[in-house]
Design a protein with these regions (language model features):
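Conserved AMP-binding/adenylation subdomain of ANL enzymes
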Residues: 219-237, 247-285, 300
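Conserved AMP-binding A3 loop
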Residues: 68-70, 189, 196-220
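AMP-binding/adenylate-forming catalytic core of the ANL superfamily
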Residues: 125, 132, 142-144, 404-532, ...
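Conserved AMP-binding/adenylate-forming core of the ANL superfamily
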Residues: 35-40, 44, 56-101, 105-109, ...
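Conserved pre-ATP/AMP-binding loop-to-beta segment of ANL
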Residues: 56, 167, 181-200, 207, ...
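Structural core segment of the AMP-binding/adenylate-forming
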Residues: 2-19, 81, 85-86, 109, ...
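Gly/Ser/Thr-rich phosphate-binding loop
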Residues: 259, 281-289, 298-378, 419
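AMP-binding/adenylate-forming catalytic domain of the ANL superfamily
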Residues: 526-550, 567-592
Length: 595
């Protein structure tokens, strides 16, 4: 530790952040104080405060829809009236299954208004995973957009706790909300420690798990990200194409902008061809990204409006080191602020100094042991411990699993909550790490830290991988595959593909007879598009460990190059699963065959 303190580069990087720090804290600390002194316990109260102080200022816009702060406040009241009429009361959970729109935000805050928790369901889910997401939240009512209603109806019988489905169309104010009372709905008593939303995350148990986010944590996320990452200024506008059912969109987008009273421009989903048109149309000065979005833009043909553009700052995560400088220079982005975190984690890392490729650093937190990287044996799938039974810290630039210390004492809704399922929460905790009785959150990610204290993402561990900006549970995909006739055994892994972000899904299967690619296509069609395997490897058997765990590491090392894999390989195309030969593999590598 003392050698690091003596390092000139480490000292200079700390000083750079100290110089930046007071500027950021001038925004962060006052907000924290104001929320404390004025007893603002929820984002609903922030929205109502904005409506009282700036009723005619723009809050949200999308295409031809514009919502001022006063109109947003009115919409939350009308949503609350509808929910109350459906029997929703304080302490209930309401599932929200809808695409991005200003009404989405009004719906979430309307649920707060009646004292309910909003379960934000991934719009890509269908069939059993969708039914599970609704059922595990214990929601009795689902608020769904008309474009997604049919998918929900198809699995309605699997949702045993579900009583009501409330559907809204493209103009909910003339439809679902048309006959609501004009009088404001009285606010339910909401405390900062109450659950605000459930955000679903995929993990090793397979199906989506709801992660609990309190009102306090939602406020803290926005209060920190607004000044620290965006450095919001008068006249700013945030453009968000990321789904609002994810933490990035709702907590790091909506919460941050609302607390700073910065308007947001939304889009239903990302479009590379329309991105710069929208940026100019909305005069967006800040954008929220995931790495895949940046890669799409960099690999897109030149757009007449890409330069000059009004974007000053881009905030997000997952930006690959090779894409970072190309994205910044091609589009003239003044500042890129990368971060690392997870919805269920008790902390995050932020890169406010702009070092390319890094997810950031926490100089004081790192010294205090808040973040630790420990030795992890990928082949044995276990942490290494010393003769005393404690974990072994990694040296500089040594790859290991990132751990985040769980505070022993926290209050006011800021304590670590994890998932609604206590057993799932328990699986994310590692105890007796460096001393008896301590506990850390397992990130499930491999990172390294350099001599200057900067952290770098390396890979995911085990049973999840990331593709198209979504976490894919290998257990969930394998479960769907093996539930269909024709497949005796299956395992799923993520494999890197040249010039692609994340990892593509590879299903290694042992068929009961001759492999039928059309039958396999039908078997995985209920999975979200991003979770459907891009590659299939047909094998005679799957090697297992002494404890009968399927050995995945050899499959990962061998990958999907047909010149080095002896088994038949298939690749997912628009026509279905087709044999992957060396010619098709070349098309994949050079981008002619889209995955």
């Amino acid at each position: 530790m003392f050698e690091r303190l003596a390092s000139p580069s480490w000292r200079s990087s700390v000083l750079a952040e100290v110089r930046f720090g007071p500027k950021a804290l001038r925004g962060t600390v006052p907000w924290l104080l104001r929320t404390r002194l004025r007893q603002i316990d929820s984002l609903l109260q922030v929205a109502l405060k904005n409506a009282a102080e700036a009723p005619h200022d723009l809050a949200y816009e999308m295409e031809h829809e514009h919502l001022t702060w006063s109109e947003l406040a009115n919409a939350t009241s009308r949503v609350a009236h509808v929910l109350a009429a459906a029997g929703v009361k304080r302490g209930d959970v309401v599932a929200l299954f809808a695409e991005n729109s200003p009404f989405y935000i009004a719906s979430v805050l309307g649920m707060t208004r009646v004292g309910a928790t909003a379960a934000l369901v991934n719009t890509n889910l269908r069939g059993r995973p969708l039914a599970h997401a609704v059922e595990v939240s214990k929601a009795r009512v689902v608020l769904v957009s008309h474009t997604l209603e049919s998918g929900l109806r198809e699995c309605e019988e699997l949702c045993q706790s579900l009583d009501r489905i409330l559907t809204f169309d493209d103009n909910p104010y003339a439809g679902l909300l048309a006959n609501t009372p004009a009088t404001p709905y009285p606010q339910a008593r909401v405390q900062a420690e109450d659950d605000f939303i459930y955000i679903y995350t995929s993990g090793t148990t397979g199906l989506p798990k709801p992660c609990r986010v309190s009102h306090a944590r939602a406020i803290l996320a926005g209060a920190g990200f607004g000044p620290l990452m965006y450095d919001f200024r008068p006249g700013d506008k945030l453009y968000c194409v990321l789904p609002l059912y994810h933490a990035n969109g709702l907590l790091l987008g909506v919460s941050a902008a609302m607390l700073a009273r910065v308007p947001m421009a939304l889009r239903r989903s990302f479009s590379a061809s329309a991105f710069w048109d929208d940026v100019h149309r909305y005069k967006a000065t800040a954008i929220l990204y995931i790495g895949e979005l940046c890669r799409y833009l960099v690999n897109s043909p030149p757009h007449p409006k890409e330069l000059p553009n009004p974007v000053r700052v881009a905030v997000g995560n997952g930006l690959r080191p090779d894409i970072w400088p190309r994205f910044k220079s091609r589009f003239g982005i003044e500042s890129i602020r990368e971060f690392y975190g997870a919805t269920e984690a008790p902390g995050f890392i932020a890169n406010i100094s702009g070092r390319e490729g890094s997810v950031g650093r926490v100089p004081l937190g790192g010294l205090a042991g808040w973040l630790r990287i420990i030795q992890y044996d990928v082949d044995l799938d276990q942490h290494l411990r010393d003769s005393r039974g404690f974990c072994i810290p990694c040296a500089d630039d040594e790859v290991g699993e990132l751990l985040i210390r769980v505070p022993k004492i926290a209050a006011g809704g800021l304590e670590y909550r994890g998932y609604t399922d206590e057993s799932a929460t328990e699986k994310k905790l590692l105890r007796n790490v460096f001393k008896k009785g301590d506990q850390y959150f397992r990130s499930g990610d491999l990172l390294r830290r350099d001599a200057d204290g900067f952290y770098y993402f390396v890979d995911r561990i085990g049973d999840t991988f990331r593709w198209k900006g979504e976490n894919v549970s290998t257990a969930e995909v394998a479960d769907v595959i093996t539930h269909n006739d024709g497949i005796e055994q299956a395992t799923v892994i993520g494999v890197p593909v040249p010039n692609m972000d994340g990892q593509a899904g590879l299903a290694a299967v042992v068929p009961s007879g001759e492999f039928d690619p059309d039958r396999f296509w039908r078997a995985v069609s209920d999975l979200p598009a991003y979770a459907q395997p891009r590659f299939v490897r047909v094998m005679d058997g799957l090697a297992t460990t002494g404890t009968f765990k399927i050995q995945k590491n050899d499959l990962k090392k061998e990958g999907v190059d047909p010149s080095s894999v002896g088994d038949p390989l298939y690749v997912r195309t628009k026509a279905g699963y087709e044999l992957l030969n060396e010619e098709r593999w070349l098309d994949v590598k050079e981008g002619r065959l889209k995955l």
